[in-house]
């Protein structure tokens, strides 16, 4: 059988990782799917972070 084209990825807030002065403890993470053929590089999306309480850039992690 062939591998599926779509894979599940995890998106993590970039500002929660680096900024210790935030509203609450923790790191915001979202799960999503991406097409392996169309998007070969790491995905970056603007999503709402509940810990920073605003929209921030979320990058794909392993």
Swiss-Prot record:
Source superkingdom: Bacteria
GO CC annotations on file: cytoplasm; ribonucleoprotein complex; ribosome
UniProt keywords, alphabetically: Ribonucleoprotein, Ribosomal protein
GO biological process terms, semicolon-separated: translation
GO molecular function: structural constituent of ribosome
NCBIfam families cross-referenced by the UniProt entry: PRK00504.1, PRK00595.1, rpmG_bact
Family according to the record: Belongs to the bacterial ribosomal protein bL33 family.
Protein name: Large ribosomal subunit protein bL33
Originating organism: Trichodesmium erythraeum (strain IMS101)
Gene name linked to the record: rpmG
